């Protein structure tokens, strides 16, 4: 079966970029064989192509940087010239390319602006023992009461305030105890996890929150005045803020699933309650980078912004990068004059303020806030997972590469407002929890969408089996139910079957004629703008039909889906524009942004999502088979009967194999070292292994047939087990559930057996559930100790610090989440002694800085568990992982219980860790061993990468000497080919970063080149293999290719073409084998009047060609099994970056790569570069 998906668009359809490239996709061409399409994914309605989506996101972001930089430059110029900044006109203006220098300057202004907000002061200190002051804000002396007019005359020289000067020891600005705190913080592995420090000015003892983070030149210390003199009150206030956040998080977690809108509405209410701002909104970033207000809580007299859409430029990519690095951003007063940062002249560039809590807003943003009547703001990033593994190191404010910025929670206030750092930190935890909850909701929504698509596909397939192909438009459900659209149509055997909003029959025939002429070599097309796709009749269709997806079934049969323009879907809940607001279109204001957004999307539809295109492609494949069967006269009923016969034969053959597997499984279960037992659908025992018999004292013969609930467990476990059985018999399998088993015979005197079980649904060969199997772990020893420990009323230290191996790792928290106990088992497990952790905050200092956690969300989850336990809500078997002092990764289950006084008042929490079994630890050790081998291979590659440069320099030098000699024409051609190969290899070695290829940021070095030279270089690289395998090379290359010139990255094109050709050489059959190179260049006329060169290459060989696993690797984005597949996958991505595409097609007698590369002509490329 063919598999494929659409190509990635070069630009978002509605990102306020005035002349955005068209959002258009092509499917692969299949001619009776197996076709694979560049871009990953595939049929079946599932969503693949995560890497393609990531590359698409990166390409959009890179493109938007240029527009952001241009708007920034226009704003700066308008301020310098005294003219007003017309926001809407600036968006509509035709884009002028921004140079790399302009973009770099723009990013520097945003990230290294050199000013801070005046509600605090900033220091930059050398990260060494000198604590030398590298930079400070001009208000530092005043805030720290170090100015001469603040000091009191004294004869004591030590009372004279130290000067705030570059090069001075920063510790002298603070009280001695505060200096000690700073020294400890500087020595920490992850300094930001200790924030905030409570420090005092040396002279006035005024308290400050010190928020620290490391940068390229040292450590930045942001100082914000604190509101109380007592550090204990400060800690209690911070804990109280965290408790409020945890309470809000608990409410979020209690919401019914499947309602993202309700989740967002609840978040804005809680954030407004927590922070007191006048307006709180949830901004969501769409796939095309534009934003939308999806939830809002506001003061009654404020204008609503719910439903507002705004262009991508309203929140520039540089700002989005800052939100990824610093998740919480506060502006206390947009009218306040910024304070300059004075820095050491020896620093090579302005101080990096990306992570600073005090960084001053840019003038453009401050003006935007003022125009909308917002004086103060608090903005929090909403980060969700985009697939991939967690990062191994946690750093507050930083996020793993597998996370994405979903949106923002934005708070506005109509007067100056400054909330203390502990409350902002608590909000950050709330946002992390919101992100986790949102991620689950989005995954659920995606799964429901996939189920809907699969159900619709199933019904459509059923129609095709029972009826003619026209049933998919004449019956219900129809093809309109497959994806979201305003209309759909089938063009079959010259007849037109429209549904909903569609073009007329005359118009659809015109569209088909255009598709045949301009896109006849593909199997489909999708676009959000027919006008931008180049369709001449787009204007006649009007707003009713803007976007279209089409799938070719046969050369004369087509499926269509249509969408109307985006503006139809969008309504703003805000106030209407009043005629007297004359400057509304020019001022930077939400209404202006909404107007600009509608202007951009007026001729566009909503974009076609990857999952929708996969669903369309799957139906396309099904219909192809159906139409082919119909053409061949195959009876559907006969096909079904034949299929059933074949299925029956397969089942009979499989029964013997299943029996063999079943016997082996029974043997493994019987000899397992963990308790395993099973029940039938009535809950009666039908499996009881030797280990559970040993633990309970009940033999296999005695256990068989007994009721698990009525005969074998204690009454307190009955409800749990009944629920467990009921869910497992429905197919819902639960894990880590504790049950209490009875003991019999000699074992009865030892008391009950506690086991943690995983319930697995048992199925027969027809996949019907026939029972439940329980795989358990005996935790009786730990449970008994834990229960005694929790219930003890007197001195518990004898138990805590008992070296008995039955005592589990235990630590305790006081009411302020500070560590109050750390037993011997915890010391042994973590490598950290009791003295090193007691008194420190468990959240951040102990677990975070001492014991590093795996990913930032792990810290949030631990904080929630701890606060819930302190508040009286126990937690059992919470998965908890961390790195010990030596970097060893520890995986455990955490049980947290409330710690109470005799009168029942909660004073903290007891926490117990249950460590993974030795078998599981051995599996982790094997995994680490594989990681170590991968690291060794990386070192080998780094060595090769370094050493290969010297021979390359020698080849380059030799070629340069030969160029200075008198050579014949054929010798000069050989030299040109050798030089081209050398430069290709140099390019690969120089740009060896696969990450830049993966994320779409690879820089292409474009220039004019000769196609003849490229083909000579490509062929020369496969000649040795051709001769060794005695293969014939067939060249079907027109003479004009030798003289043709094009504009692009010559050596990357050589690399890609050579890899694809070499693959055909390697897998061509040796006997009577051949490899064919075919090129058919032509000129493509674009809608803007320019011409481009279209180069379709075909590399073919007889037979099946590449093995399936290599083809699969080529279109994979993350997992590879073959070395050749990795190389082809990288080349496919490079080709995609150059605007090309590749298909692998397998026909009955031959296989071939079909590569299409579209390149500008050198003259037009040069004219564009100078315009």
From Swiss-Prot:
Compositional bias ranges of the Gly residues kind: 38-52
Kindly name one Pfam family recorded for this protein: PAS
Alphabetical GO biological process terms: detection of visible light; red, far-red light phototransduction; regulation of DNA-templated transcription
GAF domain location, by residue? 259-442
Instruction: List the PANTHER family hit by this protein, alphabetically.
Output: OS08G0260000 PROTEIN (PTHR47876), PHYTOCHROME 1 (PTHR47876:SF3)
Q: Where is this region: Disordered?
A: 1-53
Biological role = Regulatory photoreceptor which exists in two forms that are reversibly interconvertible by light: the Pr form that absorbs maximally in the red region of the spectrum and the Pfr form that absorbs maximally in the far-red region. Photoconversion of Pr to Pfr induces an array of morphogenic responses, whereas reconversion of Pfr to Pr cancels the induction of those responses. Pfr controls the expression of a number of nuclear genes including those encoding the small subunit of ribulose-bisphosphate carboxylase, chlorophyll A/B binding protein, protochlorophyllide reductase, rRNA, etc.
Assembly and binders: Homodimer.
Instruction: Return the SMART domains for the record.
Output: GAF, HATPase_c, HisKA, PAS
Domain (Histidine kinase) ranges = 943-1161
Name of this protein: Phytochrome B
Q: How is it modified after translation?
A: Contains one covalently linked phytochromobilin chromophore.
Keywords linked to the UniProt accession:
Chromophore, Photoreceptor protein, Receptor, Repeat, Sensory transduction, Transcription, Transcription regulation
Similarity-based family: Belongs to the phytochrome family.
Ranges of compositional bias, category Low complexity: 1-19
Q: Which residues form the PAS domain?
A: 661-732, 795-866
Which residues are phytochromobilin-binding? 364
Gene Ontology molecular function, alphabetical: phosphorelay sensor kinase activity; photoreceptor activity; protein homodimerization activity
